[in-house]
Each structure stands twice: as structure tokens, then as C-alpha cells.
């Protein structure tokens, strides 16, 4: 979509740059040509539709972020990390884990949330 828009704008820009100098008054032919160019370019400039489609039966997954922070922990010797020392103990005692997990919601809970939202909208 962006490529089409860029090509269309490049064509219009090159046509404007290479046109002969025109008089101060625009005649009917120039107005019609400008309107035609605008009609061609306008559909390309509208935003593209989102392709976020959910089909029933597919699994819903989302990134789940887990932060492990063992700074100041003295319960055990931290021997999990095998890499080089960073120079600061605080940096070596933290970890961030990102994992895609299936998100499941019970149908009855979803129904209750929907009804609650609809009731809230009706009351306004």
C-alpha cells in the first residue's frame, strides 16, 4: 500500500516538475486534469484496513513477559548464569523471559464481561 502511494506521488511530482510554465489563470482543461489526478490518487491515500481477524477454533496466543529479579537474594548461591561477569552484580541477577502462551477464557466469563459492558453502555 505504501509502495503504491509512493509511486503515485512520484508520478504526480514528476509531472508537476516537468510541466511548462503556466499563466496565472487556470483554464478549464487544467482544472479537469488536476481533478482527475486527485481522483486517481485519493483512493491510494486512505488507510489500509486492519487484518486482525479471529476465526473460531483457532488458538489465541499472546506474549507473556516474566521478570526474574534475584538482586539481593541470599537464600542460595546463584549458579544458573554461566556467562561472563558484567562488572556489576545487579546486572547479572536479573532476567527477562518472553514467551508466547495460549490465552484461554471460559465462555461464561466472556459472556458476563460482554453483558456488563453492554449494561454500562446502555446506562450512559
Curated annotation (Swiss-Prot):
This protein's record includes keyword Plastid: yes
PTM statement from Swiss-Prot or TrEMBL: Contains one phycocyanobilin chromophore and one mesobiliverdin chromophore with binding mediated by both the alpha and beta subunits.
Protein residues bound to mesobiliverdin: 73, 81, 97
Membrane topology: Peripheral membrane protein
UniProt GO cellular component terms: chloroplast thylakoid membrane; phycobilisome
Biological process annotations from GO: photosynthesis
Main location per the UniProt record: plastid
Binding site for (2R,3E)-phycocyanobilin: 71
InterPro entries: Globular_prot_asu/bsu, Phycoerythr-like_a_sf, Phycoerythr_a
Keywords carried by this UniProt record: Bile pigment, Chloroplast, Chromophore, Electron transport, Membrane, Photosynthesis, Plastid, Thylakoid, Transport
Top-level taxon of origin: Eukaryota
Subcellular location: Plastid, Chloroplast thylakoid membrane
Its job: Light-harvesting photosynthetic tetrapyrrole chromophore-protein from the phycobiliprotein complex.
Miscellaneous comment as given in the Swiss-Prot or TrEMBL entry: The light-harvesting system in Cryptophytes contains phycobiliprotein complexes. Unusually they are composed of either phycoerythrin (CPE) or phycocyanin (CPC) but never allophycocyanin (APC), with only one type of biliprotein being present in any one species. Unlike cyanobacteria or red algae these proteins are not arranged into higher-order phycobilisome complexes, and they are found in the thylakoid lumen.
Similarity section: Belongs to the phycoerythrin family.
Subunit comment: Heterotetramer of 2 different alpha chains and 2 identical beta chains which form 2 alpha-beta heterodimers within the heterotetramer.
The protein's name in its UniProt record: Phycocyanin PC645 alpha-3 subunit
